[in-house]
Amino acid sequence: MSGAIAAAVLAAFGQDIYNSIFHRPPGPLGGLPVLIDHSSEIVREGYFVALPQKAQLQNSQLKSLSTGKPEAYDWAMARGGAEGPRTSIKLVVEGHREHAVKIIGVEAVKERCHEPLSGSLFAAYSAGGEENISMLFDLDAPRSLAKEPGGEDPSMLSDYFEVHSISLTRGEQQTLVLNATSEKRYCEFKLKFTVVDGKSTVAQWVDDSGRPFRVTSLRKFNEYGSLYFGGVSTYQCGGGWVRRDPQSFGDQNPYSFSGGVGC
């Protein structure tokens, strides 16, 4: 409502009526105790995306992907692809009660898992950094509870919520970056938040816009049906995406690969 209308109300009806219209105290809030927004884009300097099927891209398609129309990541994910060996999820959580609410647990609940994807691999290598990770989830564990980030072995990490909790007042926001990893298989999962709301404990579920999140472990190069390189690995070739024979790279691990791709 404009300032002119507010001034007119004040002049015509007095301070009490003005306050009742413009200075109403916030009413009780219904719905879930925490608003969870998954619309924020993660910064991906580099990534690996595997497809369940073998993709035979033509040069014209590679040229389109190289110019970012569409982005190769989006193209592959729209065709059933999964990041590997980890996927990053950015969430913004916001308190939605008059009193403070507290997040006391987050779990990645697996819906199904099977052999890692082997159709095609898109490998975009990066020389840059990554966003700071808030929590880590090991999908190879029997239960994938939130862990403190850091270290090479997820099984040795401390449970995040044994030492932390996340308290949110009304409208207070916090950004979380979650990493889910697998070194053994492909998994689909959803996130379960456990929230204390006054005297009640509530479970809130988060998925990827109506679908489960996905992650796959990486196979050796020669186990993929087709292979595409991008990122800094192709700068010597003029940049963009290039197709290579997976057998030419043998049994090397894509995640630790540091060689050239040839031009």
Predicted feature descriptions by range:
Residues H99-E107, L117-S120, K147-P149, E188-K190:
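Short, hydrophobic/aromatic beta-strand segments
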Residues Y73-G84, V92-V101, P116, S167:
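Short, solvent-exposed beta-strand/turn "edge" segments of beta-rich domains on protein surfaces
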Residues S155-C187:
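Low-complexity, intrinsically disordered segments enriched in Ser/Thr together with acidic residues
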Residues D140-D153, V196-C263:
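Acidic, serine/threonine- and proline-rich intrinsically disordered appendage/tail regions
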Residues M1-L65:
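Membrane-aqueous junction of the first/signal-anchor transmembrane helix
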Residues R112-P154:
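Long, charge-dense
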